[in-house]
From Swiss-Prot:
Keywords: Hydrolase. The keyword Hydrolase applies. GO terms for molecular function: 6-hydroxycyclohex-1-ene-1-carboxyl-CoA hydratase activity; hydrolase activity, acting on acid carbon-carbon bonds, in ketonic substances. Pfam families: ECH_1. Disulfide bonds: none annotated. Belongs to the enoyl-CoA hydratase/isomerase family. It comes from Syntrophus aciditrophicus (strain SB). The gene is bamA. Pathway: Aromatic compound metabolism; benzoyl-CoA degradation. CDD domains: crotonase-like (cd06558). Homohexamer. Its EC number is 3.7.1.21. The lineage of its organism: Bacteria, Pseudomonadati, Thermodesulfobacteriota, Syntrophia, Syntrophales. This is 6-oxocyclohex-1-ene-1-carbonyl-CoA hydrolase. Involved in the central benzoyl-CoA catabolism. Catalyzes the addition of one molecule of water to the double bond and the hydrolytic cleavage of C-C bond in the alicyclic ring, 6-oxocyclohex-1-ene-1-carbonyl-CoA (6-OCH-CoA) to yield 3-hydroxypimelyl-CoA. Signal peptide: none annotated.
Length: 382
């Protein structure tokens, strides 16, 4: 018997939570666009898209301002319920940076010494991480340059990473006045060994894309530069043709001396002249999206959420506690660290005097303006 007698509604519902007010085209902003799905031959597939969320603040290495965070949230939450979207691609503008985290100028000049304000900001930041982890579409991180600090945290919240081989990865908090508790301390142990996770989280060392590929943090590291004959050139600043040297693993480690100096100059000249090509990365992103498109969407997302849940477990347990600590920290070490970094053009130094800081602590000194004056740099003579 037909069920035509049952009343049914057939118009499509709009489940989008946000309007276009959170996106823009002029830096600093978050750019949101839908790009047509293409098959392996480059043919456009009607009615299906990948959603691209791009951090657009290249003058400050794509650090996210408060308004940009809102744009990222809007992009992921709208993509999550957009029936036309197959996958989300999260990237940045230009060849230098995917994202270097929060905007230090904002942190230093506005949020430091305002713990409640920073707590409100962390509500947005936590929502941004959640919007990635909760997106009901696969999320690809297209790393176009350095993925550092908060940029590493939102990057490791994604599902798959395809990277420029010029990119570097790492944290910056303990050196500049914060702690990597916006995701890194929760996510890194799933990617790396516990000792690698510990050292990468606290040392503030920058590791190459090839080193991170070897250590399983990312899926692909691909070249973006060519020589004068049009041949692809792997990042010449790190070892890619040697795995072991004198008993030590050197693959992905930085070169030193004159060789490093020459390689750095060659890379910088290429980037200065905008002589780079992301076609290999984009082809790999397209390939991955096409794989996703040819899977059952419900089964795909159930599988992805099953993997994500491991990352989400500790993040969900302690993200609220982190919010309070980070707000309180804005009254002390964050004021010093972000302030030093933000005034480096004034003082010539981007960090405090760490040894003097520890000496004053050892003396039991009161942490007041006199204390801070002793550890911060001094304005250079004009």
């Amino acid at each position: 018997m037909s069920l035509d007698w049952m009343p049914r509604e057939h118009g499509l519902k709009n489940h989008s939570r946000h309007t276009e007010q959170w996106w823009g085209t002029e830096a600093p902003c978050t750019v949101y666009e839908k790009r047509p799905l293409k098959d392996p031959k480059g043919n456009v597939v009607p009615g299906l898209y990948s959603a691209w969320i791009r951090l657009n603040n290249p003058g400050q290495y794509n650090s996210y301002t408060t308004e940009m965070v809102k744009g990222v949230i809007a992009g992921f939450e709208n993509s999550s319920t957009d029936r036309e979207v197959v996958a989300v691609v999260f990237t940045g503008t230009g060849p230098n940076a995917f994202c270097t985290g929060g905007n230090t100028k904002e942190y230093s000049e506005y949020y430091s010494m305002r713990p409640e304000e920073y707590g409100s900001y962390m509500e947005l930041f936590n929502n941004m991480v959640d919007s990635i982890l909760m997106c009901k579409k696969p999320v690809i991180c297209r790393v176009n340059g350095m993925r550092v600090a908060g940029g590493q945290e939102i990057g490791t919240a994604t599902d798959i990473t395809v990277s420029s081989d010029l990119a570097i990865f790492g944290q910056a908090g303990p050196r500049h006045g914060s702690a990597p508790v916006g995701g890194a301390s929760d996510f890194l142990p799933w990617f790396l060994s516990i000792e690698d996770a510990m050292w990468n989280c606290v040392s503030c060392e920058m590791w190459s894309a090839y080193k991170m590929k070897a250590k399983n943090l990312i899926s692909k590291a691909l070249p973006v530069l060519k020589d004068d004959k049009g041949n692809w050139v792997r990042n010449p600043q790190v070892y890619t043709d040697t795995y072991v040297k004198d008993g030590e693993i050197v693959y992905g480690e930085p070169k030193t001396g004159e060789e490093a100096k020459q390689a750095r100059a060659w890379v910088n000249e290429k980037l200065k002249n905008n002589d780079y090509d992301f076609s290999l990365i984009d082809a790999e992103v397209d390939r991955i999206v096409w794989v996703f498109a040819n899977l059952f969407p419900g089964c795909l997302m159930k599988s992805i959420d099953g993997i994500r849940q491991k990352k989400k477990f500790w993040w969900d347990q302690i993200k609220n506690d982190h919010r309070y600590w980070l707000g309180t920290n804005m009254m002390g070490e964050a004021f010093l660290g972000f302030g030093a970094f933000n005034t480096k053009k004034i003082t010539g130094k981007d960090t405090i005097d760490f040894i003097k800081n520890r000496q004053l602590i050892a003396e039991g000194a009161l942490v007041d303006e006199a204390f801070m004056e002793q550890v911060l740099g001094k304005p250079l003579a004009k």
